[in-house]
């Protein structure tokens, strides 16, 4: 949805190199709407696509009229996605916990050591973030997963054993989700709309499976009532929609 002209040209060039003689770029918001079956005259209206991916966030306003889907405005952040949620969990929860148990002074002054440890912790961060989508607390232990985090400054093996609550997770990642919500607010405000003007809100991307973001979108201050929240669309909505195009 936020591709530049250069990125679009590169995508078309790659398609031609792959042997596709006739092809057309399908915008991600259109793909999401097609995956929901919105290319139907029975579903005319205005829809907000909330696409929170692994590395980027896109919001798009889509108009459906007589079965024709049109993206009439978009906004997003190319540096906001699931990886930012994991980094927030690492920085605000996991690293402080390890610093309480181990001597990590050199990790503060040596960039490559700090980066290596933080990268190793992103897997546990994602695992716990997903687990807390379905539970109020989650446990993690490197002993159970044979994960090597290296040694601290005293030569002691670094092991992570921690329990995280949903409230802790919200405190760590809520700011990132709020950035996405604010982007949607700006998009609606720019077009003179609010949540009451939408037929519904389409959630796309793995992070939207979390109840945390759905609860934030339902807050009165965000102008989204619960009736506007749809279940998250399948993660493969773009290729699925492309397959429909090939079929037709």
Set out the residue ranges of the language-model regions:
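Oxyanion-binding/catalytic loops of NTP- or PPi-dependent enzymes
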Residues: 1-248
């Amino acid at each position: 949805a936020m591709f530049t002209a250069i990125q679009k040209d590169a995508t078309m060039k790659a398609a031609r190199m792959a042997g596709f003689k006739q092809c057309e770029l399908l915008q991600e918001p259109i793909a999401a709407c097609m995956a929901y079956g919105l290319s139907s005259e029975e579903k005319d209206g205005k829809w907000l696509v909330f696409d929170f991916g692994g590395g980027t966030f896109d919001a798009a306003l889509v108009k459906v009229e007589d079965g024709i889907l049109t993206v009439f405005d978009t906004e997003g952040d190319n540096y906001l996605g699931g990886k930012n949620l994991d980094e927030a969990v690492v920085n605000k929860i996991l690293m402080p916990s390890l610093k309480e148990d181990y001597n990590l002074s050199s990790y503060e002054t040596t960039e490559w050591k700090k980066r290596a440890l933080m990268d190793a912790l992103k897997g546990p961060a994602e695992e716990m973030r997903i687990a807390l989508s379905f539970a109020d607390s989650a446990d993690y232990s490197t002993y159970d997963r044979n994960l090597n985090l290296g040694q601290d400054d005293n030569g002691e093996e670094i092991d992570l054993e921690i329990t995280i609550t949903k409230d802790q997770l919200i405190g760590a990642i809520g700011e990132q989700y709020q950035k996405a919500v604010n982007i949607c607010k700006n998009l609606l405000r720019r077009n003179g709309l609010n949540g009451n003007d939408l037929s519904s809100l389409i959630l796309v991307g793995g992070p939207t499976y979390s109840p945390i973001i759905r609860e934030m979108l339902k807050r009165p201050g965000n102008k989204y009532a619960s009736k506007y929240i749809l279940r998250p669309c399948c993660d493969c909505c773009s290729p699925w929609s492309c397959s429909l195009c090939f079929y037709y």
